[in-house]
Swiss-Prot record:
Enzyme class: lyase
Name of the protein in question: Ribulose bisphosphate carboxylase large chain
Site label Transition state stabilizer, positions: K325
InterPro entries, per the entry: RuBisCO, RuBisCo_large_chain_AS, RuBisCO_lsu_C, RuBisCO_lsu_C_sf, RuBisCO_lsu_fd_N, RuBisCO_lsu_N_sf, RuBisCO_lsuI
One Pfam family from the record: RuBisCO_large_N
Lineage of origin: Eukaryota, Viridiplantae, Streptophyta, Embryophyta, Tracheophyta
Organism: Schlumbergera truncata
Amino acid sequence: SVGFKAGVKDYKLTYYTPEYQPQDTDILAAFRVTPQPGVPSEEAGAAVAAESSTGTWTTVWTDGLTSLDRYKGRCYHIDAVPGEDNQYICYVAYPLDLFEEGSVTNMFTSIVGNVFGFKALRALRLEDLRIPVAYIKTFQGPPHGIQVERDKLNKYGRPLLGCTIKPKLGLSAKNYGRAVYECLRGGLDFTKDDENVNSQPFMRWRDRFLFCAEAIYKAQAETGEIKGHYLNATAGTCEEMIKRAVFARELGVPIVMHDYLTGGFTANTSLALYCRDNGLLLHIHRAMHAVIDRQKNHGMHFRVLAKALRLSGGDHIHAGTVVGKLEGERDITLGFVDLLRDDYTEIDANRGIYFTQSWVSTPGVLPVASGGIHVWHMPALTEIFGDDSVLQFGGGTLGHPWGNAPGAVANRVALEACVQARNEGRDLARQGATIIRNASKWSPELAAACEVWKEIKFEFPAVDTLDKKKG
């Protein structure tokens, strides 16, 4: 037969193309590749391109029925990782026709599918994606975005304040609603369902939604401010999830919530579409992310999950704290925080950004700082995250010695003091502790909080760090 030669041939003969110039419409991926001993970097990079696009382990005669040159992924550039003996950043370009429009699910099934179990590689990590403008425009993106959210809430010029209700499991709906009310009347903008609060025997979802709505309306009437509680609509089926979102809308509350990784991108995109059509804000929790993103040499970096969320849809997403109890190196964290909020981000190796990314006016997502933070962290958080963020204090509100409402007062006073000091041109990084101490002189609630948490720190080295040359 003409043009078909059976057998196995090296991937690099077809899929390693250093002369290729990436197209504006290509999806570009940066993979951290650790080949097995004896496997050259070109073969490893080509194998990744092949297995995540049109290739398989042997030549097949049906290759002749299509144009492989049109559809194949191409490994077009390889950099050795500084400080590592056998690790490479392999850049792969994928033609846009390989992907279904508006489907994060399909994009990930191709790019981070079977290839991650490939035997020729010891480890593989997807570090970054460049999503082309042509593909971004097939997604709705966040239901509303940062500016529309501020307009809905009538809150400007400062970060928003939140609190996760604790204990996360075990409260009855009535007591849960009471905790929500105390936090909101004390000065918080939002309270939050914990990510694992769905509809358990001790508190069914419908009861929780009702008592939380009552708490919201009561707190709004007392404070004159718009309040919200992230009602977790995550459920065992998509139909049940939408049913819960519909009930939230009927109650007239402003925001619902979804666990986007455990719930899945298909469910998340459906919920985001519903939220846009029905005026609901959508808070996103990233439960399960560390299973995927914590190891430096295998898995997928959170910046990729963040980009995927901006495509799929969400108005808030948890993004680490830099200063609290959960993983997050400052430069890396700020890199993906900007990817969430900004319309255009330049390539920047110092922040782990491998590609220049334009979002063509896709709404931005508010990063949420949450996990082990308290009033002494407020100056650093205000400086690091800026106004367009949500600062969430769970234990840092509910752990106040006088109760929830005073805990909320302490956080609000600390935030307002930091914002005022920043607006006056003071250096929050250097003068933060002084700013908090001065504010506590006229707020007994803040003074009590300062006393409780004055010694608490979570200081461990980050696992996921930038690559630096040895020596």
